[in-house]
Amino acid sequence: MSEILQKITDPKEIKDLDEKELEMLAKELREFLIESVSNTGGHFASNLGVIDLTVALFKNFDFSENRIIWDVGHQSYAYKILTGRKDKFNTLRQYGGLCGFPKRTESEYDFFATGHSSTSLSSAAGMARAQKILGKDNKVIAVIGDGALTGGMALEALNDIGYRKDNLIIILNDNQMSICKNVGGLATYLNKLRMGVGYNKLKSDIGSTLDTTSLGKRVKNSLSKLKDGIKKIVVPSMYFEDIGLKYFGIVDGHNIRELNEVLSIAKSIKGPVIIHTVTKKGKGYELAEKNPNKYHGVSPFDLGEGVISKFANRNYSSTFGEEMIKLAKNDDKVVAITAAMPDGTGLKDFREEFPDRFFDVGIAEQHAVTLAAGMAAEGLKPFFAVYSTFLQRAYDQVLHDVCIQNLPVTLCLDRAGLVGEDGETHQGIFDISFLSPMPNMTIVAPKCIDEMEVILKWASNFNAPLAIRYPRGGDIDVNLKPLSKIEYGKWEKVQEGEKIAIVATGKMVQHAMIAAQKIKEEKNIDILIINATFIKPIDKELLNSLSKDGFKIVTIEDNIKKGGFGEGVLEYLNEIGHEEKIVTLAFNDKFIEHGKPDILYRINGLDAEGIKNTLIELL
C-alpha cells in the first residue's frame, strides 16, 4: 500500500519527510515501478537502482528552482513519478503516452531531453554558465552512469568543467555496468576507487580522533596539506580532483542517510563537485539483481516467471552474429567492433569464440569508426556493429577517415528504421540521408533475414566503404526467397506486374508485398515489386527500363524523405525525363515519437494499408 507515495501532490513535500519516511517512500516507489513496468515494459533494472538516490535528491533540492539532467535518461522513471506523472505511468512508452526519457514538452521538471549517452555534463555546464551570466545562484545537477562516463564527450566536458570551475554537482551513478560490462581504462580506474576503501576509512578515522582536542584540530589542519600525497599512496590516481573537481566517495547509493549527508555538504560548495555513488541495478527485484543485463529493457512480463527471451523467433541481430562467426571461421582477417553493445548487436557469441578479434571500445562511436579505418588500412576486414541512431555520433569519422581514403570498413547498422517505444532519440531513420552524400559509400539492405547471409558474405570481400542497414526484430510473415548472389548496383524483381512499380528498400519490401496482395484481391491487378538491395548506387539500368515501359513508380523506405532513397530515384528519373507519376513514401520532415512500430507505420502511411491506398490513387 502506497501510503506516502499516494499523498505526495508536489515534489516539495518530500523535503518535509524524515529519514524513516524517506525510506518508506523509496520502498513504495520500488514496488510501484516493479508492478507498473512489468505491465508496460520499459527500462527496468536501471530505474530500480536509482530510486534511493532520486528520493534523496528531492529531499535536498527544490527542482522548481534547481536543475537536474539525467544522462541517457532511461533511469528517470522515479523522477517522473514524483513530478506529477504517476497517474499516467500506465501509458509509458505508448503512443500518446509518457515518454521513456526526459522530454521538455512533457513536464516543466524535464529541463533537458536526453536519450543518447554522455551528454549530461556538457548540457549541465551550459546551464550552470547561463545561470551565472543571468545572475542566478541555483544548482545544476548531472546524474551520469559509469558506462556513460566512458564516452568521449563526457570526458571532454569534465576537462572543461574542472578548468572553468562551474557551479554544478555531478553524481556518478556507479552500478559497475552500463548495458553490458564496462570496458576501458576509466572502468578499471573506477574499480580501483571502489576497492580503495583504505583511504576513505583512514581519512575518517584520523579526522574523528583529531577532532577530540584543540591541539588535534590544529594538527588536522596541518595534515590537510598532506592530503594529496596520502590519496596518491592509498587510492590510485585521484583523477577527478587532479582535473579540478571536489570528489566525495564512495557513497552507498541505497543508504538514504549517507546520501543526505553528502548532498547537504555538496550543495554548500561553490564550484564543481562529483559524488561517487555505488548502486545495484535491479535493486528490489531478485531476478533483475542477478541478471541486470537481461532486465535492462523489458517487454511486459509476469513477475512470478520473470522475463522470457525477447525474441523467441529469429531476428536480424542474432542472425548477424551467427553469420559473423561463420565469416570469421573462414577468414582470419575478419574482426568485429562494437561500442558497448555486444549483446544488443548480436556479437556476444563472437566475443566468446574470437576474443582476439573482438573489440568493445565502450561508448565511443567516433573512436570505433577510426579504429576500424586503421585496421582496414593494414589489411583487416573490420565490421562495426552499431545502432543506426548511434552512428550519427561518428559522422565526421565515417566521412574523413573512411570514405575519403576509400577504406573497406563495413558499418552494420542495427535498428535501422523504426525502433518504436524508445522514440525520437532512437529511431534509425536518418542513416540513408547522412550516408548517401558521402562519395565512395555503398549502402545495402536485406529484404529478409535469410538474405543477411549472402550480403555479409559478399561484404567480406568488398573493397570499399559499405553500410548494411537492417531493422530491429524479425520478419513479417511473408514468403520471400533470399538472393542467391549479389551483383553490384543491381536490384531484384521480386514480383512481376503492370502499370505500377514499387521500388522498396529492406524490410519495406515485406510491407509492399502485403499491400500488393491486397490490390490483387480487390482490383485483380498485379503490382511490380522491386527489391532495391542497393540503396546507393541506384540501379539506373532498371529505372531506364521502367520509364521506357511507362510505369508509375512508388518508392518506399523507412527513412526520412529529405535526402533519402526516394529523392535519389526521383532526381534520376527527372534527369531522364520520366513522364509518369512518381510517389515517394517515407517519413516526413519531423521526429517520430514513441509508440509501437505498427501504430507508427500506420500513422505515417507506411503500413500495408497505407501503401495500398497510395496504389489505389495511382490506378
From Swiss-Prot:
Which cofactors does the annotated protein need, by name?
A: Mg(2+); thiamine diphosphate
What's the record's note on cofactor binding? Binds 1 Mg(2+) ion per subunit.
What is the catalytic activity of this protein? D-glyceraldehyde 3-phosphate + pyruvate + H(+) = 1-deoxy-D-xylulose 5-phosphate + CO2
As recorded in UniProt, coiled-coil segments are none
Disulfide-bonded cysteine pairs: these are: none
**One Pfam family this sequence matches:** Transketolase_C
Which InterPro entries would you find in this protein's record? Dxylulose-5-P_synthase (IPR005477), THDP-binding (IPR029061), Transketo_C/PFOR_II (IPR009014), Transketolase-like_Pyr-bd (IPR005475), Transketolase_BS (IPR020826), Transketolase_C (IPR033248), Transketolase_CS (IPR049557)
EC top class, as a word: transferase
Which GO molecular function terms does the record list? Answer: 1-deoxy-D-xylulose-5-phosphate synthase activity; magnesium ion binding; thiamine pyrophosphate binding
Which GO CC annotations does the UniProt entry carry?
cytosol
Note the subunit structure.
Homodimer.
User: Mind telling me what this protein is named?
Assistant: 1-deoxy-D-xylulose-5-phosphate synthase
Q: What is the source species?
A: Clostridium perfringens (strain SM101 / Type A)
**According to the entry, what is the taxonomic lineage of the organism?**
Bacteria, Bacillati, Bacillota, Clostridia, Eubacteriales
Q: Corresponding gene?
A: dxs
